[in-house]
A protein has these predicted regions:
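N-terminal helix-turn-helix DNA-binding core of bacterial DNA-binding proteins
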Residues: 31-73
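Charged, amphipathic alpha-helical coiled-coil/dimerization segments
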Residues: 79-142
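Secondary-structure edge/capping motif, primarily at the C-terminal ends of alpha-helices
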Residues: 4-5, 60, 148
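C-terminal ligand-sensing/allosteric alpha-helical core of TetR-family HTH transcriptional regulators
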Residues: 15-33, 106, 117, 121, ...
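N-terminal leader segment of winged-helix/HTH proteins
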Residues: 1-40, 132
Length: 149
């Protein structure tokens, strides 16, 4: 039987330790998403919906799956964001039973505000990080996101 990555005890222990540390270090040193959400006057879950929709129109079920939020909890988020004029809902041309959710121009502007808030936070990172370290962080993030897709 072929060996799977979970059979590698050292790898599993290392990843467990790294993910454990990331739980508290990522928000402290890199991205304080709660501060961003508060500054924009929306809950974190609504902010995350907007971030997911940046990739294009998707169904409520796909939003639920990507954010690991139960479908019944996604619907009120979508309704609230629709009421704010940030997103819209429309029936799929391919499957009339499916409702697609997408960004409105105001939602696209809000996504840019989120990106700007992230840039602002990056500007407040300690100046003693050097260019080489920041390139390593960026490459590690890119590799992690590539694997996650």
């Amino acid at each position: 039987m072929p060996k799977v990555w979970t059979d590698d005890t050292a790898l599993m222990e290392g990843m467990t330790d790294n993910l454990f540390e990331a739980l508290y270090k990522m928000p402290k040193y890199f991205l304080r998403i709660d501060d961003i959400a508060h500054s924009l006057g929306m809950p974190i879950s609504s902010l995350l919906v907007l971030c997911v929709l940046r990739e294009g129109k998707i169904s409520i079920g796909e939003i639920s799956e990507r954010l690991c939020i139960a479908k019944p909890n996604v619907t009120p988020l979508v309704e609230t964001l629709c009421a704010r004029g940030l997103i819209s809902r429309q029936r799929s041309d391919k499957d009339r039973r499916k409702v697609l959710v997408g960004l409105m121009p105001e939602g696209e502007a809000m996504v840019e505000r989120i990106r700007g808030a992230i840039r602002d936070q990056m500007m407040s990172w300690p100046r003693d990080y050097n260019l080489s370290e920041m390139k390593r962080v960026n490459n590690a993030l890119a590799a992690t996101l590539e694997v996650a897709d």
